[in-house]
């Protein structure tokens, strides 16, 4: 079964992709599982080198990736360029973090207690449609740095930048099977990843409602779960703030900046934290 990918700004088709189902999901998990022993044994310095190479490739292909992101998400190219630049920064950061997560040796009475940090195994990464490349990098970076292998499921509406990132992982020298990208429905591919016994962890960004389903599905195999749900992005206004600017910026509906920021990508107007004195004296604003 094929999936037609649209540019939401023009509603024009921009790609036709094969949709993964349960069988393809199982195959991807099997590939990731087979790649795990060798990848987890790669020396930290070598993993860091590969992540730096990946970051460099993102920088070298920034314009291409930005145009993919702009066309697939329907956002201005200027914003997409900034987001892809941040993707490279994320991979650079985790390249530097590879040798910073380690265990401890703790002296105790009559002996020594030691802790070790080890990769989990296969992790399922499920990302939303609003910042597909950015959020994919937030999940790919730490998973790769720690020696895990990956099945990445982008939103079926916006899979194109994730596919290109998967190709760049191979170009960077990350072995085949370490990063697997699946295009398919959340109710099929996502659900199978959540319930699969060989997936050790799920990292999900999306709605609170679906997050509850992720927790319920993962409970059967007692896998670890990281959820980023229903962000409120509250505005915090202190006593000495410029209230005119705060009042204007909070709804994010001003021309140009606000209209793009509110184009069904993210919103900020639902929450505001005010200093108590402001509530007492200037609540009218």
Enumerate the language-model features and the residues they cover:
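Short coil/turn connectors at secondary-structure junctions
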Residues: 117-122, 146-148, 175-177, 197-200, ...
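Short beta->alpha connector loops at strand-helix junctions that form conserved
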Residues: 148, 153-155, 183, 205, ...
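Conserved small-residue-rich beta-alpha loop and adjacent elements
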Residues: 101-176
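A structured beta-alpha segment of the ubiquitous adenosine-cofactor-binding alpha/beta core
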Residues: 112-113, 180-200
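ALDH superfamily catalytic-core signature
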Residues: 209-285
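N-terminal Rossmann-like NAD(P)+-binding subdomain of aldehyde/semialdehyde dehydrogenases
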Residues: 1-111
